[in-house]
């Protein structure tokens, strides 16, 4: 018994749709975190992407001892971590301000003000760990005997 035209038509249609879906699909695209890291590399002189792991991208720059970009944590959407000497140089503040302006889409002077305020507040009166909020960014600065670090995040709901 031969298959009638009513059975062939749906089969051909399904095969054609599967073929279009296979070849017509867009190519795989890098996620937003990798795009942000590439944009940072293109915009900031001396910045290099060193290692990409899961949701952390480690970066290198002469002004910072450590520099990383974290994406999609439990409580934040994007995180910028940087570490420098105990008394950071102005180049470090410029680096964090430039990176913060690109990542969090805020003006560079605002990012510079927030990061420098956070790091400069550490001392005898406020201690070696300072948490503050500036322009909808959460900043946490910590200091040891030899180095200072800053973590800049934006919450998921903002």
Predicted regions and their residues:
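Short glycine-rich, low-complexity/disordered patches
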Residues: 28, 49-56, 105-135
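Long, charged/polar, surface-exposed segments that mediate recognition or autoinhibition
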Residues: 72-122
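Bacterial N-terminal signal peptides that target proteins for export
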Residues: 2-15
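Short N-terminal segments immediately surrounding and downstream of signal-peptide cleavage
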Residues: 30-50
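Secreted/processed peptides and extracellular or luminal domains of membrane proteins
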Residues: 39-40, 77, 124, 147
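Amphipathic N-proximal alpha-helical interface segments
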Residues: 52-94, 129-158
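Sec/Tat signal peptide C-region and signal peptidase I cleavage site
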Residues: 24-30
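Bacterial N-terminal signal peptides
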Residues: 14-22
